[in-house]
Amino acid sequence: MLNDAKQTRANPGTSRPHSNGGGSSHGNELPRRTEQRAQGPRQPARLPKQGKTNGKSDGNITAGETQRGGIPRGKGPRGGKTNTRRTPPKAGAQPQPSNNRK
């Protein structure tokens, strides 16, 4: 009986910090993953449109090739977006020395 009570107390105690810690880490990763997923479908959506303009009959064959080429291209812009995010903090650091001069 006493052993059962101790186990029940230990279980919720361990589950609470574990769930909170895991949830916080996953919460940070999820938004990053969603951003990458959003970028993927946007680019292929533009490529099929180009393939249709080239030729509807042969568009099916060319569309597959254009989509494959578009996927590696999508990886390049992702790096550029990360650079843009890094730039704003740099701009914020510039006014700080000016305040010190004052």
From Swiss-Prot:
Highest taxon of the lineage: Viruses
Cystine bridges: none
Residue ranges with Polar residues bias: 8-17, 51-65
Compositionally biased region (Basic residues): 75-88
Region feature Disordered, mapped onto this chain: 1-102
Functional description taken from the UniProt entry: Not known. Encoded on a subgenomic RNA (RNA3) synthesized during replication and which is co-terminal with RNA1.
Protein name (database record): Protein B1
Annotated source species: Black beetle virus (BBV)
